[in-house]
């Protein structure tokens, strides 16, 4: 049986460069004792979409490799187009981290609201969809700077909190988020048929 991303996803293997470009998703890689530099975080612009596409390919490749029936192979060009569209949406936050003018990470999040119902109260959160840091800048404060900036945006938007999910395989990311005060509150299970 073909893997789902082979059958249903637009993919370009040439864009799946991953660690060859010195990139790693949150929770992976090491800083190798490098000196922490000043990290500047700013909202991404249309001029940043190619860099976002390259960084996104790393996150996507990790997930596609780990769960090929659930995640498509990376396509940096398509990801750049995706981010170009997202940047125009008022409920979307895309942040870029830079050190010395070099792109070293990004965060993509979306404001989500739930009305109160019989079972659950009203909720307004910033859902963190993706975060990625260059592997050569891991443990250098990039991820922390991105998450801090996201939290500041959530506060300025009057949201109740931030929410995210991470793959059960990604223990490094889980430890990173725990170090920032994130706690597990839900476990999703799946059975493939």
Where is each model-derived feature located?
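Conserved GNAT acetyl-CoA-binding A-motif
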Residues: 154-165
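Conserved acetyl-CoA-binding loop-helix of GNAT-fold acetyltransferases
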Residues: 130-133, 139-152, 175-179
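Conserved beta-strand in the GNAT
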Residues: 96, 102-111, 127, 132
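Conserved beta-strand-loop-alpha-helix junction that forms the acyl-donor binding cleft
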Residues: 163-173, 190-193
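A short helix-loop-beta-strand connector motif used in the catalytic cores of GNAT acetyltransferases and
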Residues: 81-96, 127
